[in-house]
Amino acid sequence: MNRRSSYLLGCTAFILYSYETSGDTKDSCVFPFNYKGFTYFSCTRTNSLSPWCATRAVYDGQWKYCLIEDYPRCVFPFIYRGRSHRNCIVEGSFFGKLWCSVTSSFDEKQQWKYCEINEYGGNSFSKPCIFPSKYRNHIISECLEDESNKLWCPTTENMDMDGKWSLCADTRISSLVPGFPCHFPFNYKNKNYFNCTTKGSKENLLWCATSYNYDQDHTWVYC
């Protein structure tokens, strides 16, 4: 049997088996999970045409197809080819898309995902973060971590009143890594920036602020 036939047979077996083992799609993915002796830190296509995850730490027949919000968040910094990376990278990507490791060492686990460059999920139709925002009578200016280790943000100026939120883009959360100089978002001339910008640069070079309020602190670095 050639490799293609073996793969198709495996997919068919998984699909047929799934009719009897499929878990409730409302269940959450559990990472890491063990499936047939292998440990998975993210959704997988093993024996399936679509990405899926187990909803138990040890696969017992309960699983679900992965939605975008089911994927784990990026782990920064991570090791790739012996180098430490504090943000999403395109190195090694066949399609030039940003990606990240979902463990601290890609070299060791080879577990990864494509990076989300915009906010997603939540209850506000994937609207972007709004900072600063009021939450539990505090003013917040960065993404917050929930009980499932996901990072989220308010999408209105008053989370306490409106209750609207999204999951934070992977490209945004790198700003929370200790030692990463940029602060995203940062406010420059009364406008929020979520990525490096050339605005205000006489040399037309990308730069970012290292605190939320550039107009107040005037601290910045080139990207």
UniProtKB/Swiss-Prot annotation:
Coiled-coil stretches noted in the UniProt entry, renumbered to this chain: none
BP GO terms, sorted: single fertilization; sperm capacitation
Signal sequence annotation: 1-23
Keywords of the record: Disulfide bond, Fertilization, Repeat, Secreted, Signal
Disulfide bonds listed in the record: 29-53, 43-66, 74-100, 88-115, 129-153, 143-168, 182-208, 196-223
Chain ranges of the Fibronectin type-II domain: 24-68, 69-117, 124-170, 177-223
Post-translational modification, as annotated: Not N-glycosylated.
Protein location: Secreted
A GO term for molecular function: heparin binding
Domain of life from the UniProt record: Eukaryota
InterPro entries in alphabetical order: FN_type2_dom, FN_type2_sf, Kringle-like, SP_Capacitation_Regulator
Main location: secreted
The keyword Endoplasmic reticulum appears for this protein: no
Keyword field contains Transmembrane helix: no
Pfam families for this protein: fn2 (PF00040)
PROSITE patterns reported in the protein's UniProt record: FN2_1, FN2_2
GO cellular component: cell surface; extracellular region
CDD domains: FN2
Tissue specificity annotation: Detected in epididymal duct epithelium and on sperm membrane (at protein level).
Family listed: Belongs to the seminal plasma protein family.
Function: Binds to spermatozoa upon ejaculation and may play a role in sperm capacitation. Has phosphorylcholine-binding activity.
Protein name: Epididymal sperm-binding protein 1
Lineage of source species: Eukaryota, Metazoa, Chordata, Craniata, Vertebrata
